């Protein structure tokens, strides 16, 4: 989400404890347990929302606590202290009002962060991990995966996408593996740790309806009195990871990227918010694309408040930014992903839009616009402005992710591969319809302005496929295979599918039993690779019976399990990953 807003409740910190008897997620009975083992029945305080009763109270299962510094307000003057007390009083009243109404499942923390979606504490490097099987000799570097991991317990609405960014890393050298996980120290998280409470708003979980407006007013009031500072960004950096310009970048579309450094022993340290030496002043979406031949990075930035609602830009391999190309849109549109070909960028303008005025009507600002016709914009990669943009309509098409795109000169078409999701806004707004994510081929004719769409997998073997990739060495070129998470039973991932994009043939790899994973990351075998699928699939897998997590390494040709790395602590289900080879690690800026 790209809502750059801020706010301030004041709850207790998470105890990060989980009971193995309640592991099924999402379920209200799934167990995330906090500092207290019994429900709190304290009287609400008039001056601190930290005394508000917890939303979640579950049995305690021993687990390390996060280290949170004592609240430091020593720099505040008497006026600021008085303002803080008054605003806390107002927020306590707001929370009382919110607690009188049930939360929809899409923002209820008892659903959103239960079971193995629940957060974990940081883990310092653990080396010489147990390995079943043999790690292929060609794997030399670090596999990293990003995810949402809230440090503080929610006091109100919370969506899975709202959590603080945490990167999990497995470093592999000569068949030996180590593991660590660390929060990305965003400006948001640093301030929250200083004040001992989540003072920034949750863009999806809290900013909706009249209470969302009230939270924004509280936030701006706190900023006015100098109780917080949002000028250095409000993002969580929890979604994407990319290695570019000698830097590992953690990203979410509500802020600039953050540079994270991998240390020699496999630990992680946040360097800071990265603006490409002052060239980048706006947020960047979490799915930039790197051309495997030119090594350029392509990106978008969208704004939900003011025009231009969308901008396109690129970076040279040396990190030099191009001028922004403003893309004309009638309204702010969710732009989570896009695609590139050898000569074009492919930009989806779909039916999930932002309408902030709906908050005054008590509604969510994220909505499905049934009157809008979805379309794709095809823009030359080196365009100086949007005058060369060709728009092709593709009705009723919503792809949260696009896996690849390429040009078909013989038919004057651009071919786009994506998972078409219905209902389009079901991730954000509660609905009764069953969610479907259908792998599709969308053909955009640049001469006629017409489009066609076909389902790639036959109906008899149709399944929800979300999160995955093609061989990134062929990004923007025609690919035969895609590796995609089997999101069943939704939202869990029971395995992954290797799909032949031409024939629709599907080969599945299931984790088995009560094991579930996430995004399958394809790692090419190396320069000596014999074919497009010559490589390995890497994915974190969690066993909901033993409550243990592993890294699985699967042969991408045969789909046979090559090695299993036993991890020292639980890895929650998360988002997107990357791999940094050992040579690049040595060259980090």
UniProtKB/Swiss-Prot annotation:
Per the entry, induction is: Low induction by drought stress.
Q: Which Pfam families match?
A: RPE65
Does the entry feature the keyword Lyase, yes or no? no
Give me the residues that bind Fe cation, please. 287, 336, 401, 576
Q: How does it assemble?
A: Interacts in vitro with VAR3.
Cofactor list: Fe(2+)
Enumerate the PANTHER family for this protein.
9-CIS-EPOXYCAROTENOID DIOXYGENASE NCED5, CHLOROPLASTIC-RELATED, BETA-CAROTENE DIOXYGENASE
Which one of the record's GO molecular function terms can you name? 9-cis-epoxycarotenoid dioxygenase activity
Biological process GO annotation list?
Answer: abscisic acid biosynthetic process; response to water deprivation; seed dormancy process
E.C. no: 1.13.11.51
> What is the protein named?
Probable 9-cis-epoxycarotenoid dioxygenase NCED5, chloroplastic
Enzyme class, spelled out:
oxidoreductase
Note down the stretches annotated as region Disordered: 21-51
Does the entry annotate any disulfide bonds, and if so which pairs?
none
């Amino acid at each position: 989400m790209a809502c750059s807003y801020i706010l301030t409740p004041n709850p207790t910190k998470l105890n990060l404890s989980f009971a193995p008897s309640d592991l099924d997620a999402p379920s209200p009975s799934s167990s995330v347990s906090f500092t207290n083992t019994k429900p709190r029945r304290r009287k609400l305080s008039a001056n601190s929302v930290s005394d508000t009763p917890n939303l979640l109270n579950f049995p305690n299962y021993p687990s390390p606590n996060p280290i949170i510094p004592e609240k430091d307000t020593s720099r505040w003057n008497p006026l600021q202290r008085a303002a803080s007390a008054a605003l806390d009083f107002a927020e306590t009243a707001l929370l009382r009002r919110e607690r009188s109404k049930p939360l929809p499942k899409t923002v209820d923390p008892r659903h959103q962060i239960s079971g193995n979606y629940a957060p974990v504490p940081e883990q310092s490097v653990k080396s010489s991990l147990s390995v079943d099987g043999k790690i292929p000799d060609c794997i030399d570097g670090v596999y990293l995966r990003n995810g949402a991991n809230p440090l503080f317990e929610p006091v109100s609405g919370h969506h899975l996408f709202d959590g603080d960014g945490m990167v999990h890393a497995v470093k592999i050298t000569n068949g030996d593996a180590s593991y660590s996980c660390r929060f990305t120290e965003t400006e948001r998280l640093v301030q929250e740790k200083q004040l001992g409470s989540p003072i920034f708003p949750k863009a999806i979980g809290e900013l909706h309806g009249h209470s969302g407006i009230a939270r924004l007013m509280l936030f701006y009031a706190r900023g006015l009195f100098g109780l917080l500072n949002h000028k250095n960004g409000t993002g969580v950096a929890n979604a994407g990871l990319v290695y570019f310009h000698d830097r590992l970048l953690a990203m979410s579309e509500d802020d600039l990227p953050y540079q994270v450094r991998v240390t020699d022993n496999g630990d992680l340290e946040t360097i800071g918010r990265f603006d490409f030496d002052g060239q980048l002043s706006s947020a960047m979406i979490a799915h930039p694309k790197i051309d495997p031949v030119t090594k350029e990075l392509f990106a978008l930035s969208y704004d939900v408040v003011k025009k231009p609602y969308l901008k396109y830009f690129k970076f040279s391999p040396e990190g030099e930014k191009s001028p922004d190309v403003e893309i004309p849109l009638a309204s702010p549109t969710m732009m989570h992903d896009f695609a590139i070909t050898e000569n074009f960028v492919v930009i989806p303008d779909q039916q999930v839009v932002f309408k902030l005025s709906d908050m005054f009507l008590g509604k969510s600002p994220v909505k499905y616009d049934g009157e809008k016709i979805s379309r794709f914009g095809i823009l030359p990669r080196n365009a100086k402005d949007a005058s060369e943009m060709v728009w092709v309509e593709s009705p009723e098409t919503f792809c949260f992710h696009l896996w690849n795109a390429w040009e078909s000169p013989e038919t004057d078409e651009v071919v786009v591969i994506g998972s078409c999701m219905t209902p389009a806004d079901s991730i954000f707004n509660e609905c009764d319809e069953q969610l479907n994510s259908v792998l599709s081929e969308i053909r955009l004719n640049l001469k006629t302005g017409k489009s066609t769409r076909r389902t790639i997998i036959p109906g008899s073997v149709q399944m929800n496929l979300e999160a995955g990739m093609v061989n990134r060495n062929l990004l923007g070129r025609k690919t035969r295979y895609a590796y995609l998470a089997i999101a069943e039973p939704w939202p869990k991932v029971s395995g992954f599918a290797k799909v032949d994009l031409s024939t629709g043939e599907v080969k599945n790899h299931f984790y088995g039993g009560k094991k579930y994973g996430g995004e399958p990351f394809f790692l090419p075998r190396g320069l000596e690779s014999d074919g497009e699928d010559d490589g390995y699939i890497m994915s974190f897998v969690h066993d909901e019976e033993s409550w243990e997590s592993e890294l699985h390494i699967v042969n991408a040709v045969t789909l046979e399990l090559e090695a299993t790395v036993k991890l020292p602590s639980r890895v929650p289900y998360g988002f997107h990953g990357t791999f940094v080879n050992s040579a690049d690690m040595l060259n980090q800026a």
